[in-house]
Amino acid sequence: MNICNSLILKAMPAIALAIPLLWQTPALAATCTSGSTCVTVNGNGDSVLDKEAARQSKEQWNETKNLRTKVNKRAEKEFDKFDKAIDARDTCMKSTNINAYWEPNTERCLDSNTGMPIRP
C-alpha cells in the first residue's frame, strides 16, 4: 500500500503536465498551415446569410418607421383639426354678436338670422 501511494505521488506531477498537452493536441492539429486548404464554417459570423438577414431586418425597420411616421402625421393632423374646431367654438361662444351660434355638426359659427357663416 505504501509503494502504491508513493507511485501515485511521484506520477501526479507528470499527469498534471500531460493532461493540458493532451487537451491541446486536437487544436494544434486543426490549425491551417500555408500549404493546406482550410474551410472555416461560420468562423467570424460574416456569412452571406447573416448579411441577408441583416439587410432584411433593416428594410423591415425602415418600412415600419415610415408607417409610424405616417400614422403620427395623421394623428397630429387630426389633433390640429380638433384643436382648431375647439378654438373656433370658443371664439364663437365669446362673440359679442348676439346672432352668432355654434353649429356642432358642421363646426362653424353661423348667423342665427341668415344661417350664413360669420367671423366673430
Curated annotation (Swiss-Prot):
Annotated family: Belongs to the UPF0482 family.
UniProt keyword annotation of Transcription present: no
Pfam families: DUF1283 (PF06932)
Signal peptide extent: 1-29
Name this protein carries in UniProt: UPF0482 protein plu2232
Keyword entries, A-Z: Signal
